[in-house]
């Protein structure tokens, strides 16, 4: 009971009892003990009774024993006494050193760094709960990691801080002087008058005003990104900087007029901050000090620098980038001296010591932030154009005997054997040439090596047989958009499992052998890059050509056996379309293949035999003997009008394709080839070193007496309704 009574007695102290105990009624005692003044203005600390419950507070006698006149304030005690940040005069929270509180410095620094790139800064509202919690933490003096907080939240809390300053930042006592200086007509006179009024502000107010106006100036210069120019900023933050003492008693119209005047004043201060406050802007001590906001100097700046998504759009960065710093953490030594001057002396001394404005320092910081270091954020990837140039450089198309691409030493083709050196996305379709079929892979060869002709023919034949077993569709190489290689190479055909394959009808075995050099090919009939390549070589020379007959990649070889034939023809027979090839074959009976005797006795065969003086017919044994002989040179090209004519026809006439009718039985039994002038190259399938039985038909075309040729074709005669599918080819 006694304990309860004593406890109640201590809780029933009122203001009069406390005044008698501490004996501090005079105004001088209040100045000597700032805690009492802070308690008078801060009701949340001084109240003894809460609405719902009572809070235990320190008794005033205990406080007075600690705050005796004989004892001085220590650093830690002063920090505890000045824990309250809001609703305090700047002269109290700044202290005798005239330095801004640490949280305010940190907030200004973050706003200076992130504000120009944040849309709606100072305009957008923040979460109310987060705002209250942050204010409580700052008021209590707890260490708060401001870097992790949203920029809009910091801007809202900073506006609350300005609103809570007694008599406002621009001082309500100087309201009439501010308005009088603003009403001057001449801009120079207006600036001088505003300078004089600014000098009348208390030193802490002037220090905070300079920092704030410079930050707002930086934000307004980047208004195309943050949508906040000087006018918008003045509307949002102006009423928190200057008001009248009795503004709440004003009418709505008077309040509106007052806000317009304050908005005009703040906007003019933002636009003319250098003319009014000078270019030597004192640097934030938080930027240069080692113990203030180190995360902004190192971790925050380095995170923004390494983040490839961060991009500063401040136009001031480009103008100030010439004096940029090497890294954001290495600051110049002169601003550090400036910060020391701020900590030890007043703003006048700081203006004399600081040789560099804060705008340049911040701009240099942002300039370094605008250059992301991709070593940390993402790998360095060359663009598609760079890949194209590098791969084209590594890929060498030689003019040697085999016409094989020889990769350079150390090139990417040697190390990436399993990788397709010509991906689809690297070679876009340009000027009639598109991507190479995805099934084709280039075999890597040693530099300077040339495969023998027999091995090359075997490789081509093997790839044809493999492709026949896989039955995977491939794009037509005769299309103007499907000729990528101007020179012929060795390919290994592979089937992609992810792509649907189309089953084609079984054709004769003549698909797998190396045909006559004058066999109809899509490259020549379409007038593609192959015929353009030969127009440069008027001198006959041995060459391997890539001929795709019904999708099979085969090797064509010339032969020097019948030089009389080459001399007999004054012009090289140009590439013919499908109609020209089968016109002679269907001369008398369209749609029905001629027999061997009829083809031998046809007018085209007799004409060729009479003019070229070649062998009319050859047996399989004679062809097998002739194909082992030396290869012949190609005859000269036909005139330009023949090439253009065939190209025109080739673009319109379809070639043999997918929809093929079954072969007639008598075609399957035919094993004789009608050859004119040249013999066939040696081919062999996989596991078949010998020549396969040839099943073909002899056909002749009569164009004129100078331009006629008996062509051997591996396809059966098409029906009339099958020519519409003739331009497609499949493997």
Curated annotation (Swiss-Prot):
Biased composition (Low complexity): 319-329, 464-480
Domain (Rho-GAP) ranges: 88-277
Basic and acidic residues composition bias: residue spans: 494-503, 641-652
Annotated GO biological process: regulation of Rho protein signal transduction; regulation of small GTPase mediated signal transduction; signal transduction
Disulfide bonds: none
Site label Arginine finger, positions: 123
Gene Ontology MF annotations: GTPase activator activity; guanyl-nucleotide exchange factor activity
Keyword terms of this UniProt record: GTPase activation, Guanine-nucleotide releasing factor, Phosphoprotein
Stretch forming the signal peptide: none
Region of interest (Disordered), ranges: 288-421, 464-507, 641-662
Residues bearing the modification Phosphoserine: 400
GO cellular component terms attached to this protein's record: cytosol
Coiled-coil residue windows: none
Described function: May function as a GTPase-activating protein and may play important roles during T-cell activation.
Start-end of Polar residues biased regions: 299-311, 380-399
Descriptive protein name: T-cell activation Rho GTPase-activating protein
Pfam families linked: RhoGAP
């Amino acid at each position: 009971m006694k304990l309860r009574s004593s406890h109640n007695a201590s809780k029933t102290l009122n203001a009069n009892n406390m005044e008698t105990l501490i004996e501090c009624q005079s105004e001088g005692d209040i100045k000597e003990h700032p805690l009492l003044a802070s308690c008078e203005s801060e009701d949340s600390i001084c109240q003894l009774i809460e609405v719902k419950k009572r809070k235990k507070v320190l008794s005033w006698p205990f406080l007075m024993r600690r705050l005796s006149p004989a004892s001085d304030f220590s650093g830690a005690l002063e920090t505890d006494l000045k824990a309250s940040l809001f609703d305090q005069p700047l002269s109290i929270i700044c202290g005798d050193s005239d330095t801004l509180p640490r949280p305010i410095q940190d907030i200004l620094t973050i706003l200076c760094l992130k504000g120009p790139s944040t849309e709606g800064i100072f305009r957008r509202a923040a979460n109310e709960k987060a705002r209250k919690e942050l204010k409580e933490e700052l008021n209590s003096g707890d260490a708060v990691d401001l870097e992790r907080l949203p920029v809009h939240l910091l801007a809202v809390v900073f506006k609350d801080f300005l609103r809570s300053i007694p008599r406002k930042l621009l001082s309500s006592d100087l309201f009439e002087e501010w308005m009088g200086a603003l009403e001057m007509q001449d801009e120079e006179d207006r600036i001088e008058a505003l300078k004089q009024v600014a000098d009348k502000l208390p030193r802490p107010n002037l220090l905070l005003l300079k920092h704030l106006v410079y930050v707002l100036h930086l934000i307004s210069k980047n208004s195309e990104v943050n949508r906040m120019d000087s006018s918008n900023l003045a509307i949002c933050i102006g009423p928190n900087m200057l008001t009248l003492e009795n503004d709440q008693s004003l009418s709505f119209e008077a309040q509106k007029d007052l806000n317009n005047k304050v908005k005009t004043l703040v906007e003019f201060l933002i636009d003319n901050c250098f003319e009014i406050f000078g270019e030597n802007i004192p640097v934030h001590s938080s930027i240069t000090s080692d113990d203030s906001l180190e995360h902004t100097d190192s971790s925050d700046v380095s995170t923004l620098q390494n983040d490839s998504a961060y991009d500063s759009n401040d136009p001031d960065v480009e103008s100030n980038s010439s004096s940029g710093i090497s890294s954001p953490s290495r600051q110049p030594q002169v601003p550090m001296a400036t910060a020391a001057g701020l900590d030890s002396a007043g703003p006048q001394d700081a203006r004399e010591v600081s040789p560099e404005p804060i705008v340049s320092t911040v701009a240099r910081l942002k300039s370094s932030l605008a250059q992301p270091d991709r070593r940390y954020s993402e790998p360095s990837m060359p663009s598609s154009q760079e890949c194209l140039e590098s791969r084209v450089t590594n890929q060498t198309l030689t003019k040697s005997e085999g016409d094989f691409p020889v990769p350079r030493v150390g090139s990417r083709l040697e190390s990436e054997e399993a990788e397709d050196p010509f991906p689809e996305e690297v070679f876009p379709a340009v000027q009639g040439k598109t991507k190479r079929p995805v099934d084709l892979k280039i075999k890597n060869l040693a530099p300077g090596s040339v495969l023998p002709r027999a091995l090359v023919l075997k490789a081509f034949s093997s790839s044809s047989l493999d492709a026949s077993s896989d039955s995977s569709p491939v794009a037509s190489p005769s299309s103007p958009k499907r000729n990528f290689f101007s020179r012929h190479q060795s390919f290994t055909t592979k089937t992609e499992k992810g792509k649907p394959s189309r089953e084609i009808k079984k054709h004769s075995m003549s698909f797998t052998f190396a045909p006559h050099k004058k066999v109809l090919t899509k490259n020549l009939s379409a007038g593609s890059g192959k015929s353009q390549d030969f127009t440069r070589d008027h001198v006959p020379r041995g060459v391997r050509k890539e001929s795709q007959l019904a999708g099979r990649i085969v090797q064509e070889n010339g032969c020097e056996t019948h030089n009389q034939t080459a001399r007999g023809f004054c012009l090289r027979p140009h590439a013919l379309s499908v109609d020209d090839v089968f016109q002679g074959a269907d001369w008398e009976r369209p749609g029905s293949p001629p027999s061997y005797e009829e083809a031998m006795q046809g007018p085209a065969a007799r004409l060729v035999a009479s003019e070229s003086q070649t062998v009319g017919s050859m047996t399989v044994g004679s062809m097998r003997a002739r194909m082992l002989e030396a290869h012949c040179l190609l005859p000269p090209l036909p005139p330009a009008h023949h090439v253009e004519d065939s190209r025109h026809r080739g673009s319109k006439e379809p070639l043999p394709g997918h929809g093929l009718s079954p072969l007639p039985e008598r075609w399957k039994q035919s094993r004789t080839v009608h050859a004119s002038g040249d013999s066939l190259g040696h081919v062999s399938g996989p596991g078949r070193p010998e020549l396969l039985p040839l099943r073909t038909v002899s056909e002749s075309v009569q164009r004129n007496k100078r331009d006629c040729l008996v062509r051997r074709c591996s396809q059966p005669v098409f029906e009339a309704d099958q020519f519409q599918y003739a331009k497609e080819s499949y493997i």
